[in-house]
């Protein structure tokens, strides 16, 4: 008997076939750099910086920016942001810089230049007669890179969220050490004229490069990161959610995964912890792998590890966290089952703590405490093992262990308890639910059961 086949009749004729569904054909690509070469892009001919500044500023004022010119200018302007490397800086075996080296954002990557001239038109009809100062260059670089952050804000954010962010960014770049170079609301107007800056590969690369530099190097103009910070761990929401989750429930990654009672986690956990990556290395290229073009399809995104992502945010919803209630459910990754497991884990880690004395008046008191704790443990081990099932605690002692939680789920037939449903409905009904969010899912799924 073939375990993959089904047998049935059509017009009295026996049919045997293997049902096959469409599978995702895209290969997840890990960002590990194998050739020991720095990430690289190719741009047009390096411009005269004074001419380029005037052209790009006039284009910004007229909301007519040429993306190629913007990228060429941003790469050339890196020379203004020299800093000192605080420690030896290596990533994936590549020596980025040595301690004490003078470096700029351009030291982190390789930027090749062709002989193709840029346009450098003065579309705004404004001609700056003098040469721009370094603070003026820094302000223009900061405003241009902020177009990346604005283009990453989704339309789901309600009200004037994007406009408010743009206004706050403009205020930063008109305050010392920066100087005011554009009229108010210019940034938002420019963004509306071309809202897809984050999809332009070279612009994305440069935003990630600037961010990687300013995240490590102390610099007068470090506030430029306000526009680029979204390139850090971009398309990593699955891994970032998991990291936040284990901190929130105060477990190690290994301890937390023992609670993941579902076969669909296996592939995702293997994918998320692929050996040879620098997920835990500070200031690694890994942090900016998406913007630096090191991975086409991220293995760490919410879609790549959808069951893990769903579970974590159902636990977050149970704990009343707004971020989880607003997050978008990965509909193809068993949200109903994940909501059940999330209810049990939420119950275990919500409103309960694991506490013990850690500080003492003197060494004698510490030793007395440790001796008393040892006696307690010996007594517990000598217990006859009688189970006290009051209040649905099926194990006396370590009720929070993975074994105890798993047993409770099985004893309830893999279904949520009434108390879980009431909690889910309580947190989601008091929240203004966004479309396809966890709050909306819980409201629609469980409100009639409460």
Swiss-Prot record:
Main location: virion
Keywords: Capsid protein, Helical capsid protein, Host cytoplasm, Phosphoprotein, Ribonucleoprotein, RNA-binding, Superantigen, Viral nucleoprotein, Virion
SUPFAM superfamilies in the cross-refs: Rhabdovirus nucleoprotein-like (SSF140809)
Remaining remarks: Displays a superantigen activity in human and mouse, activating mostly V-beta-8 subtypes of T-cell receptor.
Function: Encapsidates the genome in a ratio of one protein N per nine ribonucleotides, protecting it from nucleases. If expressed without protein P it binds non-specifically RNA and therefore can bind it's own mRNA. Interaction with protein P abolishes any non-specific RNA binding, and prevents phosphorylation. The soluble N-P complex encapsidates specifically the genomic RNA, with protein N protecting the genome like a pearl necklace. The encapsidated genomic RNA is termed the nucleocapsid (NC) and serves as template for viral transcription and replication.
Subunit structure: Homomultimerizes to form the nucleocapsid. Binds to viral genomic RNA. In nucleocapsid, binds protein P and thereby positions the polymerase on the template. Protein P acts as a chaperone on free protein N to prevent it from aggregation before encapsidating genomic RNA.
Name this polypeptide is given: Nucleoprotein
Name of the coding gene: N
